[in-house]
Amino acid sequence: MGRGLFAARKLMENRKKFRWSDRRFVRRTLGLAAKADPLEGAPMARGIVLEKIGIEARQPNSAIRKAVRVQLIKNGRQITAFCPGDGAINFIDEHDEVIVEKIGGRMGRSMGDIPGVRYKVVKVNNTSLRELVRGRKEKRLR
């Protein structure tokens, strides 16, 4: 490693070269997160419910977390989305149109004790799921 008066170019070249050893730099520079993301970098996406499923919570918790398999309209990809709220799954039927968003876990990953689920349902048939669960609104027919 040069330390002289004229070593700046070599130092800069080395920094540029060794940045590619940093996984976060590579993912950010090549835009890999957006390429792998089913939502394609968007904050929300529309989809059609394919089926309702129950997912077992991770240790030390013991529960069946209610979720749905959703096929996204924009690209046809299938994702699993969590249904937040007490009895929320009862307001969602197959073939309903839902809007999903990221669930908000660390580093864009899953959250809490729900393994492998990175998305949550926000709206059902253009009605807020939270309002449906609280009983303020009724689900509209599509």
Swiss-Prot record:
CDD domains (alphabetical): Ribosomal_S23 (cd03367)
InterPro entries registered for this protein in UniProt: NA-bd_OB-fold (IPR012340), Ribosomal_uS12 (IPR006032), Ribosomal_uS12_arc (IPR022863), Ribosomal_uS12_euk/arc (IPR005680)
Recorded GO MF terms: rRNA binding; structural constituent of ribosome
Keyword Amino-acid biosynthesis attached: no
Keywords: Ribonucleoprotein, Ribosomal protein, RNA-binding, rRNA-binding
GO BP terms, alphabetized: translation
KW Hydrolase (keyword) present: no
Its job: With S4 and S5 plays an important role in translational accuracy. Located at the interface of the 30S and 50S subunits.
Record-stated family: Belongs to the universal ribosomal protein uS12 family.
Protein name listed in UniProt: Small ribosomal subunit protein uS12
